[in-house]
């Protein structure tokens, strides 16, 4: 709350908060990642900060949060990487988002026409059914999260972290099936 109060005292109007996801150093150092209880505390902090109305706090585009969605964001979660967001990285790589690993790059502006890449590639981003594997195979909230953010997938496309399960203190491989007929 000291950081929040400092930002308010400086007249900052908006504050977007993120958490660390298990990539890079955080992949091999569990101390860098929040526990389920700590993650819920962050959501409660953002919710309380929003209710106070002194600064517009919101949670980043990390993943689907279930019941917290409307309390910590202005919009329902959607990973728009490769759908409405495209990026050109410093090396010329054409990606959807700078947080997404190189395995998902779609081209390079030094060899490819950006609009051609945008129009004719990015299928992996736009057609999400391939994500219905592993913990997402029969998950009851897949229709809302669509397999989570692309940056939360490893080089093989496997999910590294599920925010919805983390908030429920469930391991990523817990079976949370969707009722049949829905």
Question: What are these regions, as identified by a protein language model?
Answer:
Residues 1-85, 90-95, 99-105:
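Radical SAM enzyme [4Fe-4S]-AdoMet core and its adjacent flexible, acidic
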Residues 99-182:
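Flexible mid-to-C-terminal extensions adjoining Fe-S/redox cofactors in radical SAM and related proteins
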